[in-house]
Amino acid sequence: MIFEKPKRVRLKGKALSDLNRKIHNRDHNRCVICGAWVDPGKKYHHEPCGINKSDEEQKGVVLCDTCHFQRHNGKNSLEIREKIEEYLKKCYE
């Protein structure tokens, strides 16, 4: 059996800016974890992050700097990931 890697979407320029605006609009420029206001120019967070990240609306969320740092480096990284996944699932059910 052959397993195919999921295709990752990579956007640049206007397409990436438009996607960032859509994600910020969906999330009302608020961190989906703590509710803090986030500047609309701040790039969204990919979930999943790392090598599997993909520039897609249903895979991005707005995070404040603190929650973004915690998602990547904190003791509660797994908890934050689960909250993000739950939030995105509710958005696209």
Place the predicted regions along the sequence by residue.
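Histidine-centered nuclease catalytic patch
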Residues: 32-62, 71, 75
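Short microdomains enriched in Cys/His and/or Lys/Arg
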Residues: 50-66, 84-93
